[in-house]
């Protein structure tokens, strides 16, 4: 076989095949074989001379090129070679400079680079071949690619905040209901289109990979989803902050239905790992339990308290980066996982007690296994207490560790850190900070208390007395002996203040004491949070008023300035842009801008289109498309077919008696009875979803009733499409993104004065789903924003509820006749043996109707009839739907976070400049090795990661001043100004929008 010659060798043209398959020269052709031999020889000589001359000419042409390449090669010396010409004070300084040089470049975003990174993660991170690569492994690879970019931004954000000595908020929450992260992260990074195109060439559809992700099992209900929205807004609004929580191995539980009853299964969300988390084995803290406290003398002869712990374990950090939208700022949630302090008890093992050694390890890890362990037993209660303490202790230790890096005295702690308690679960953080300041940092009580009360603030989320958390004094004394002493001291000093205000008033003293002694001894955690915090806030206007005047009125008398309102909000990036992309596109097109995603108030500019028939038509087409998507999901999950042209009526939320899912299902029974009697009704699909706490018997019984009603209704041939009842199991963020955009009506029907705020009402309204509800929580403010005519309000008002309860209890109230009919249907075994539902019947009969369902039932059915009539008028309904959406700008979590930042935390917006585009030539002058390409290729480099050591030595100027063009020195290595509009100065108060 003829040897293949290099096509790049001088003097040779690229060969090509002739028709017969033989190789010929690309320049000329020899004569045919029957030609004159002399002519052939002459021709060969001619070819030789041509080839020789051409080779000589190419060699001459290449000499300048080789010289240029040599010069370029000298310019592109690796950083180590370049650094050798600079003077350093030590080898360590030089090594640091070299490390910084390699860290400065950002990952490129061109199509080829995206594909290369994706394939690299498939091959090296997942160790898979092409034949092994499934949609799930492709999701993992893409997630790792995305995480790489989040880490770049997060590292630089941390460096930027550190350089600026900013104050940050530390948001402590036992729940972060994040949902899926891939789509949200790509959208925030602006890479959806680029990755969609890059993956299409590789045979993958981006939307299919989204569906491979499992929801993170880090929360349960509204509390956790609010925390997730807040983290999104912290990053988007450029506020310095950290979220702190726990890394649950099994989440709360995976809900399934067996014979209509809720069955809890472990939520194995971490079975295949999480591509988003960053395990921080370098960040761990010892956590201590039990033991005893004794008074000893320190080295100075001072009496101090010493806690000899009986059990120790470790809290190990896992970080989840949270990107901001249309900003380079990225924050993180730090989650703690419990580990044994020694991985294995070798002593026990060597004594032959292998099972004991294993048991000790598992006992440590159990603490963060499950969200909210069932506390119906003493063991469950103790596990929950240990879980909360591990959470707060690790968090406080971590915050203090960060603060010590500033080198500032502890008197300035509150100038660098604010701590927000999301409900009472993290309240043990108050005595924990006191313990560390007094016992470890040797501060006096007054110094420690001053620092603590300037640092903490507390958000209350409930007005229900039974929901206000309490801990048994004896249990805390056993598990946390040092902390019970501190809590007693806090209480004693606080009660002196009470005595000063109300001398000799023992009833006030008992009512305000942190220690409740009315029935045993319990620590009232909300009281501890109020006493130890500088600010207390409710989460809706009505709720905050109830907190001040009904729930904590005496505290409000003492500290009226401590109490504020911060109405909740939700992020429009997830709850419109991600969950309802067609609606987002319509809004953007109609506004000719997508700025509404970071300034939701401007969608009100669309109010004038509410009467526009073509806009209404497009709006309702989008709604119908979302209903089609939900109908497919229902058929797949529940095996029920529904008509998308009828009204979709939705109630999805955590199950609790005060939320009154029971009122809803009783109205469904009434509608079913109307159909059976031949009355004309508007067709409707009624959709339920939500979990009941494992130990909440009544909530689980209501779920059973709903499914029993659904079983009868959906299988009755006389009913057909007039009524369908659907219970969607395992309600979570990802299926909420399908359910919420499809609703025509959503139900928020809690007894007035019991719901703190609610956030699902905001999500439904933003997506054009009309609300039927009581004047409770945020419903009131939504009504004020969108107009009473665009909501369906019924029921007693909060100020009437106590009077209503009394007349029901006294037997002086006669319910609507339809109420008796519905209860009779249950008693007559219409939906199965009535005995199984007897406790439900008892809970709303005989003066026991605590949540006044019987009182509100009549007005509830009447407003449902109004909905049926309005839904028939398509233009009227479309206008209501549009108004419900475009007037909801107030309910963005961005607004809420800005209010917290300005009025509670005292933090400022710090928008980091982001990477700066520079050419390869400029990158070399900054001692940054460019990835590849010609001197004029553009790369993105990090200002924060440019070495302050090498750059100052190289240019006698700071990286910031040179890149921003601020350096006026005559330095030949100064790159051109290539900031392209980025805010290099990084001053506070530069909002994204």
Curated annotation (Swiss-Prot):
One of its GO terms (molecular function) is glycogen phosphorylase activity. Residues 1-82, 962-993 are annotated as: Disordered. GO terms for biological process: glycogen catabolic process; response to ammonium ion; response to cAMP; response to differentiation-inducing factor 1. CDD domains: GT35_Glycogen_Phosphorylase. Homodimer. Belongs to the glycogen phosphorylase family. In D.discoideum glycogen phosphorylase exists as 2 developmentally regulated forms, GP1 and GP2, which are the products of separate genes. This is Glycogen phosphorylase 2. It comes from Dictyostelium discoideum (Social amoeba). The lineage of its organism: Eukaryota, Amoebozoa, Evosea, Eumycetozoa, Dictyostelia.
């Amino acid at each position: 076989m003829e040897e293949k010659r290099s096509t790049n060798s001088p003097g040779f043209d690229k060969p090509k095949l002739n028709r017969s398959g033989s190789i010929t020269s690309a320049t000329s052709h020899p004569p045919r074989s029957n030609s004159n031999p002399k002519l052939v020889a002459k021709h060969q000589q001619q070819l030789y001379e041509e080839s020789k001359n051409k080779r000589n000419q190419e060699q001459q042409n290449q000499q300048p090129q080789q010289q240029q390449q040599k010069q370029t090669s000298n310019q592109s010396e690796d950083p180590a070679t370049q650094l050798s010409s600079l003077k350093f004070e030590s080898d360590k300084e030089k090594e640091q400079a070299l490390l910084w040089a390699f860290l400065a470049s950002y990952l490129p975003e061109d199509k080829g680079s995206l594909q290369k990174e994706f394939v690299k993660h498939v091959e090296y991170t997942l160790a898979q071949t092409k034949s092994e690569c499934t949609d799930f492994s492709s999701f993992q690879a893409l997630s790792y690619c995305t995480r790489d970019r989040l880490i770049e931004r997060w590292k630089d954000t941390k460096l930027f905040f550190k350089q600026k000595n900013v104050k940050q908020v530390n948001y402590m929450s036992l729940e972060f209901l994040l949902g899926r992260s891939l789509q949200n992260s790509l959208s925030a990074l602006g890479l959806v289109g680029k990755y969609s195109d890059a993956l299409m060439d590789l045979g993958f559809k981006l939307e299919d990979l989204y569906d491979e992700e499992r929801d993170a099992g880090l929360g349960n209900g509204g509390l956790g989803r609010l925390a997730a929205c807040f983290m999104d807004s912290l990053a988007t609004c450029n506020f310095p902050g950290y979220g702190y929580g726990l890394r649950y191995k099994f989440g709360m539980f995976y809900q399934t239905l067996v014979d209509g009853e809720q069955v809890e299964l472990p939520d194995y969300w971490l079975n295949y790992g999480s591509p988003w988390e960053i395990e921080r084995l370098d960040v761990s803290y010892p956590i201590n339990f039990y033991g005893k406290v004794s008074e000893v003398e320190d080295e100075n002869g001072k009496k101090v308290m010493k806690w000899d712990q009986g059990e120790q374990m470790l809290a190990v950090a896992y970080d989840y980066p949270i990107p901001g939208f249309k900003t380079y700022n990225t924050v993180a949630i730090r989650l703690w996982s419990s580990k044994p302090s020694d991985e294995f008890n070798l002593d026990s093992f060597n004594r032959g007690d292998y099972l004991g050694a294993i048991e000790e390890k598992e006992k440590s890890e159990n603490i963060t296994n499950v969200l909210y362990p069932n506390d119906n037993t003493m063991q469950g209660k103790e596990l929950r207490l240990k879980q909360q303490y591990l959470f707060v202790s690790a968090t406080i230790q971590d915050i203090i560790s960060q603060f010590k890096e500033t080198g500032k005295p502890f008197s300035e702690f509150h100038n660098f850190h604010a701590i927000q308690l999301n409900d009472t679960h993290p309240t043990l953080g108050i005595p924990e900070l006191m313990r560390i300041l007094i016992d470890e940092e040797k501060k006096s009580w007054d110094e420690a208390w001053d620092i603590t009360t300037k640092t903490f603030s507390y958000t209350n989320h409930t007005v229900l007395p039974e929901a206000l958390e309490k801990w048994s004094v004896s249990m805390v004394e056993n598990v946390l002996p040092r902390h019970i002493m501190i809590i007693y001291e806090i209480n004693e000093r606080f009660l002196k203040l009470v005595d000063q205000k109300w001398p000799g008033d023992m009833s006030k003293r008992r009512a305000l004491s942190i220690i409740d002694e009315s029935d045993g001894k319990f620590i009232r955690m909300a009281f501890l949070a109020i006493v130890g915090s500088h600010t207390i806030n409710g989460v809706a206007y009505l709720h905050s008023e109830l907190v001040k005047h009904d729930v904590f009125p005496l505290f409000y008398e003492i500290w009226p300035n401590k109490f504020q309102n911060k109405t909740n909000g939700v992020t429009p990036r997830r709850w419109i842009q991600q969950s309802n992309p067609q609606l987002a596109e319509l809004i953007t097109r109609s506004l000719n801008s997508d700025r509404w995603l970071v300034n939701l108030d401007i969608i009100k500019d669309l109010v004038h289109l509410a009467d526009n028939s073509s806009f209404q038509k497009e709006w309702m087409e989008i709604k119908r498309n979302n209903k089609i998507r939900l109908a497919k999901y229902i058929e797949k999950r529940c095996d029920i077919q529904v008509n998308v042209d009828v009204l979709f009526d939705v109630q999805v939320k955590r199950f609790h008696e005060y939320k009154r899912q029971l009122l809803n299902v009783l109205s469904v029974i009434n509608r079913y009875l109307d159909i059976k009697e031949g009355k004309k009704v508007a067709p409707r699909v009624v959709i339920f979803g939500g979990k009941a706490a494992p130990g909440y018997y009544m909530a689980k019984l209501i779920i059973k009733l709903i499914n029993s009603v659904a079983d009868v209704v959906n299988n009755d041939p006389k009913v057909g499409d007039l009524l369908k009842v659907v219970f969607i199991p395992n309600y979570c963020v990802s299926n909420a993104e399908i359910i919420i955009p499809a609703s025509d009506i959503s139900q928020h029907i809690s007894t007035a004065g019991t719901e703190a705020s609610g956030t699902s009402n905001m999500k439904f309204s933003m997506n054009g789903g009309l609300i039927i509800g009581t004047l409770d929580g945020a419903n009131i403010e939504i009504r004020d924003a969108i107009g009473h005519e665009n909501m369906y309000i019924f029921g007693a008002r909060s100020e009437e509820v106590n009077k209503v309860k009394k007349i029901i209890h006294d037997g002086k109230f006669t319910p609507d006749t339809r109420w008796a009919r519905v209860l009779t249907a249950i008693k007559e075994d219409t939906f199965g043996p009535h005995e199984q539902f007897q406790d439900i019947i008892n809970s709303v009969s005989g003066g026991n109707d605590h949540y006044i369902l019987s009182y509100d039932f009549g007005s509830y059915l009447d407003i449902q009839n109004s909905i049926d009539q309005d839904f028939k008028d398509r233009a009227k309904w479309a206008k209501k739907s549009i108004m419900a959406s475009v007037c909801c700008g107030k309910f963005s979590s961005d607004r809420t976070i800005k209010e917290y930042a300005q009025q509670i935390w005292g933090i400022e917006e710090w928008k980091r400049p982001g990477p700066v585009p520079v050419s390869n030539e400029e990158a070399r002058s900054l001692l940054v090795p460019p990835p590849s390409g010609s001197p004029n290729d553009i790369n993105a480099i990090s200002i924060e990661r440019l070495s302050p050591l090498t750059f100052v030595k190289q240019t006698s100027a700071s990286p910031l001043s040179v890149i921003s063009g601020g350096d006026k020195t005559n330095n030949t290595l100064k790159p051109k100004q290539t900031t392209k509009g980025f805010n290099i100065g990084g001053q506070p108060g530069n909002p994204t929008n």
